[in-house]
Amino acid sequence: MSPAIALAFLPLVVTLLVRYRHHFRLLVRTVLLRGFRDCLSGLRIEERAFSYVLTHALPGDPGHILTTLDHWSSCCEYLSHMGPVKGQILMRLVEEKAPACVLELGTYCGYSTLLIARALPPGSRLLTVERDSRTAAVAEKVIRLAGFDEQMVELIAGSSEEVIPRLRAQHQLNRADLVLLAHRPRYYLRDLQLLEAHALLPHGATVLADHVLFPGAPRFLQYTKSCGRYRCRLHHTSLPDFPAIKDGIAQLTYTGPG
C-alpha cells in the first residue's frame, strides 16, 4: 500500500478509534492483558481473583465477597462479571419473585450465584451449571466460602445442552420458577427451547437473560417476542466499569403451557 493510500485511510481509522475507544479498552483488558497474565502466572483470571478473595474477603459473608470481587475487577483485573448495577436488578427480581427453585446457566466465578443465593427465601434451592470444569472448581470454592451448602446451592459441571435434559431424573428438578441465562448468548435460544421441550418452565416462570445487547442475543430476543409464550421487558444497563458500553437484562414471563 502506498503512503498516499495509507494517509487517505488515516482519518477513517482515527474516527473509528475515537468512536469505539471504550470497546478497544475492553478488548485490551479482557483479551490482551488477560492472556499475558494467564501465560505469566499459569493461572486463569478466576483463579487469581479467588486468591485475592481468600486474602481480602470475610468468610461466610457473601456481601463482602461480592464487594471484594468488584474491587478486584475495577482495580486489578477486569473480571467480566455481572457487577453491582446489574446485581441490584437481579437481587430485586429474585426477592420479588421469591422462587422455590432457581436454575442458573453460566456460573463463571460464582458472582451472580451469590447474588441469587443471598436473595432467596428460606428453603429455596439453586442449581447452577458451569460448562468449564476448571472454572466450576473456582466457583465451588467461592460459593462454599460464602457459607452456602450443597443443599441450598448445587453446582453442576457440564454443558447446559447435556445437563438440561437430565435435570429432572438426576437432579430432582421438576420445575424452575426462575432461570438466569448468563453463559454465552449464542446458546440462549437453544437452551430456552430445551427448557420448554422438557417442560421445566411452569406457567408464570421468570427467565432472566444477561448480555442481550452486548455482545447481544438477537435471535433469542426475536424468538421470545414473536413466539407468543412470553411477556418481555428489557432492563437497560451497561458493562461494569464501562458505562459507555450499553447492555441489558431481558426479563421474560412464561405464559405458555406449564
UniProtKB/Swiss-Prot annotation:
Domain of life: Eukaryota
EC number annotated for this UniProt entry: 2.1.1.6
Family: Belongs to the class I-like SAM-binding methyltransferase superfamily. Cation-dependent O-methyltransferase family.
PANTHER family the UniProt entry points to: CATECHOL O-METHYLTRANSFERASE 1-RELATED (PTHR43836), TRANSMEMBRANE O-METHYLTRANSFERASE (PTHR43836:SF1)
One GO MF term attached to the UniProt entry: catechol O-methyltransferase activity
Subcellular locations according to the entry: Cytoplasm; Endoplasmic reticulum
Subunit structure: Interacts with LHFPL5, PCDH15, TMC1, TMC2 and TMIE. The interaction of TOMT with TMC1 and TMC2 is required for the transportation of TMC1/2 into the stereocilia of hair cells. Interacts directly with TMC1.
InterPro entries: SAM-dependent_MTases_sf, SAM_O-MeTrfase
Source organism per UniProt: Mus musculus
A GO biological-process term: catecholamine catabolic process
Record's protein name: Transmembrane O-methyltransferase homolog
Disruption phenotype: Absence of auditory brain stem response (ABR) to click stimuli demonstrates that the mice are profoundly deaf. Normal hair bundle morphology as at postnatal day (P) 5 the sensory epithelia are patterned into three rows of outer hair cells (OHCs) and one row of inner hair cells (IHCs). The bundles of OHCs appear similar in size to those of wild-type mice and form a normal staircase pattern. Hair cells are maintained in the presence of gentamicin, an aminoglycoside antibiotic that enters hair cells through their transduction channels and normally causes hair cell death.
Role, per record: Catalyzes the O-methylation, and thereby the inactivation, of catecholamine neurotransmitters and catechol hormones. Required for auditory function. Component of the cochlear hair cell's mechanotransduction (MET) machinery. Involved in the assembly of the asymmetric tip-link MET complex. Required for transportation of TMC1 and TMC2 proteins into the mechanically sensitive stereocilia of the hair cells. The function in MET is independent of the enzymatic activity.
GO cellular component: apical part of cell; cytoplasm; endoplasmic reticulum
Top-level EC class: transferase
Keyword terms, alphabetized: Catecholamine metabolism, Cytoplasm, Deafness, Endoplasmic reticulum, Hearing, Methyltransferase, Neurotransmitter degradation, S-adenosyl-L-methionine, Transferase
